[in-house]
Swiss-Prot record:
Protein name: Transcription termination factor Rho
Similarity remark: Belongs to the Rho family.
PROSITE patterns, A to Z: RHO_RNA_BD
GO biological process, one term: DNA-templated transcription termination
Amino acid sequence: MNENAPTHKSSHKVKTHTPVSGYHIEDLRTYPTEKLLEIANKLKVENPQEFKRQDLMFEILKTQVTQGGYILFTGILEIMPDGYGFLRGFDGSFSDGHNDTYVSPSQIRRFALRNGDIVTGQVRSPKDQEKYYALLKIEAINYSPSDEIRNRPLFDNLTPLFPDEQIKLEYEPTKVTGRMLDLFSPVGKGQRALIVAPPRTGKTELMKELAQGITSNHPEVELIILLVDERPEEVTDMQRSVKGQVFSSTFDLPANNHIRIAELVLERAKRRVEMGKDVVVLLDSITRLARAYNAVTPSSGKVLSGGVDANALHRPKRFFGAARNIEEGGSLTIIATALIETGSRMDEVIFEEFKGTGNSEIVLARNIADRRIYPAFDILKSGTRKDNILLGKDRLTKVWVLRNVMQQMDDIEALSFVYSKMQQTKDNEEFLNLMNEK
């Protein structure tokens, strides 16, 4: 479980909170097995060392209830096609398990719950013939009292606008990645950005730098990192490197699981935007997500080059297209990586389909990465639409003068020139003034 995932008790104050004694499910999930055994012995669970970890947590909570305690649980609602739902834990994978909490169709209708809602409530343990915990009483929805969200708008009815507030990525003088992006490919709240990345060009490190810049400069932004079809060690590294919430579906899981995780993360982000919040989703990668959709989409009989079904890209485009700045308040920013030069014709077709859908492109170059220059950022090819709204007239003029100078250089010379000058200055303002003097 990601330690930085928000919980009801630690991150938000809820007016309707009922005092609850004992241990909470989300707390037990973070404890090492040794501590769980210690708690079990304290509660006088019989033979605790014979239980598997998940079963031991179950026994602790069941014993706690029989001794007069309550269970308070915070989870993300996943609504099934039959109308009922489950609260999934913040373990980063929304995996099915006996610790999930059942939510009845009547509760979903009564409180107008939606997919991706973060629900906090009192939970009872399973009875003899039941497999799951059951939600008894809802305390809060999306960290707010339930009566406050009854009139919340629907995400699809909100008005999209061009991004008009820049997300500052510059956070340390020596970390030039964020500084370069702030000038040459600025990211605003509500941006739909594509990181175009050949293999081994440092896209994972770039994602970490983006996450660090966002969390350092914008504490009001809720950061979500979504890793699809990634290696397990990459997931662990990301969880330990960034402060945002990391959700993942690793390459050893089926395509259906990739899609389920991605869609639940998107629904969760939409629910927060409906509440007027600013949310940033870093997706690695849109290519692998599109591959997963292609694997599960029934054949339409129309196959594009590379084996991509004509209908397979509609849903990943809908995912990417959800990014928008909202006129009524709030924003959803999606920064996704797109893989190129992998040797796969399918990946090239997917990239071509997504190339025109974003309003910002961050291009990484293999020839720059081969020179061991990081970030392998192709300044000349990268850019943001309507960047005049984000940068302002004065800064935009200076950036365009600098771009005109660099047009006479190749991509490696341009990056080396900017990199060396940024190393001599403490921030972008000083860098632009230095360039202006020349």
